[in-house]
From Swiss-Prot:
Subcellular location: Secreted
Recorded name of the encoding gene: CSN2
Species classification: Eukaryota, Metazoa, Chordata, Craniata, Vertebrata
Name the record gives this protein: Beta-casein
InterPro entries associated with the record: Casein, Casein_beta
Family annotation (Pfam families): Casein
Organism of provenance: Sus scrofa (Pig)
Similarity comment: family membership: Belongs to the beta-casein family.
Function according to Swiss-Prot or TrEMBL: Important role in determination of the surface properties of the casein micelles.
Basic and acidic residues composition-biased segments: 48-63
Length: 232
């Protein structure tokens, strides 16, 4: 009986030892698993930190690149030809505005032709140069002196064409010893035929001769010409 009791106690002790060993093994396994989990977690944290550092460095580089002025792309880099619509050939051309041409009336044409036939073109005729005679100041004639001339001379002067004033040589002023009396110049006898018409008084002043003064020398003065006479 004692042997059986001892054997039971030994079996119980072995069972307890096995249980303790199993418990210790489980604890060891749990500890190892916990260590592995801790190492895995630590590795993950380290990798996350490395990734964050890499992202920060990349962001800093991109910020530095954007700070420099970059050439902006053109709005239209490639200009394409604008398509024009092709007009059909059956379209009529645009209506043109009629141009008004000035027309002359037959009466105006007749008047212009009649004037050309009545008034012929005048041609300048050579006028012989006559020697100039010195005159004293105050020798210009007035309209009252024209009455002295005869009527045929007046009629001949009416048809005379105004000619340019002849050029006379200029001399130095010379002192006069005595004042000569006023004399009437002879009327030139050369008369050029011209159609009868009224001559204005301003045209008569074109006939001028030089006048010799005591200080001024030669200067033009009006030549005696008869007033305009219009026969009825």
């Amino acid at each position: 009986m004692k042997l059986l009791i001892l054997a039971c106690f030994v079996a119980l002790a072995l069972a307890r030892a096995k249980e303790e060993l199993n418990a210790s093994g489980e604890t060891v396994e749990s500890l190892s698993s916990s260590e592995e989990s801790i190492t895995h977690i630590s590795k993950e944290k380290i990798e996350k930190l490395k990734r964050e550092e890499q992202q920060q460095t990349e962001n800093e580089r991109q910020n530095k690149i954007h700070q420099f002025p970059q050439p902006q792309p053109l709005a239209h880099p490639y200009t394409e030809p604008i398509p024009y619509p092709i007009l059909p050939q059956n379209i009529l051309p645009l209506a043109q505005v009629p141009v008004v041409v000035p027309l002359l009336h037959p009466e105006v044409m007749k008047d212009s032709k009649a004037k050309e036939t009545i008034v012929p073109k005048r041609k300048g005729m050579p006028f012989p140069k006559s020697p100039a005679e010195p005159f004293v100041e105050g020798q210009s004639l007035t309209l009252t002196d024209f009455e002295v001339l005869s009527l045929p001379l007046l009629q001949s002067l009416m048809h005379q064409i105004p000619q340019p004033v002849p050029q006379t040589p200029m001399f130095a002023p010379q002192p006069l010893l005595s004042l000569p009396q006023a004399k009437v110049l002879p009327v030139p006898q050369q008369v050029v035929p011209f159609p009868q018409r009224d001559m204005p008084f301003q045209a008569l002043l074109l006939y001028q001769d030089p006048l010799l003064g005591p200080l001024q020398g030669f200067y033009p003065v009006p030549q005696p010409v008869a007033p305009v006479y219009n026969p009825v």
